[in-house]
Amino acid sequence: DRENMQASNRVLEDLAMHDELTGLANRTYLHEYLTGCFEHAYAEEKLLGVELMDIDFFKEYNDHYGHLMGDRCLKAIAGVLQKIQIPGQVFCARYGGDEFMIVYTGMTVEQIRRISEDILREVRMLKIPHECSRCSKYVSISQGVFARIPMENNREWDFTSRADELLYKAKNCGRDGICLSTEKSSDKCIEIK
């Protein structure tokens, strides 16, 4: 009986930490994870990367195709993210609505850039039709990536808010792309063919 109770508790804990629709970590778990990663990166003077991404013209997609198809689209994108997760290095979560966050630890800027580009390509390869998009005939994503070694005056939300700014820059650069910034570089929209 005690083993059943422990197993049930583990299932409940797992449900409380994961998004029901996508199976990715939820925002509560993400916040806890990001705080721990930030503290570790600060103490060890290691690079921390935060990426915010969302689906381009997702409201129009939902309005045109319906919420059931919208849910399928979110699950397909989550499937791409589940494939790129690396325990202890690449952590993916649903941030809310059609937004996702990826936390990168123990990696170089080049590795982070490559993974971001891989995500973009994988989403393109899904070829989910999107008649209402103004940037592609398929579902596409925009990504904002910020990576640096945390400084004394930083907090984890500084990384989140900077990634959010970069996401909006990616949208202003035409969407279906990535805007990346580090402590040593200015914001750069990366065009991926």
Give the role of each language-model region:
Residues 11-14, 27-47, 78-87, 105:
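Short regulatory alpha-helical coupling segments
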Residues 10-32, 53-67, 75:
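Conserved nucleotide-binding and Mg2+-coordinating catalytic segments in signaling enzymes
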Residues 54, 58, 77, 95, ...:
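Hydrophobic framework residues that shape the active-site pocket
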Residues 67, 105, 109-117, 131-134, ...:
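Catalytic-core segments of nucleotide cyclases and related cyclic-nucleotide turnover enzymes
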Residues 69-89, 99, 118:
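Active-site-proximal alpha-helical element of nucleotidyl cyclase-like catalytic domains
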Residues 83-89, 121-134, 167-169:
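Short catalytic/binding micro-motifs of nucleotide second-messenger systems
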Residues 90-94:
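A short pre-motif secondary-structure segment
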Residues 2-5, 9-12:
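Heptad-repeat alpha-helical coiled-coil signal-transmission segments
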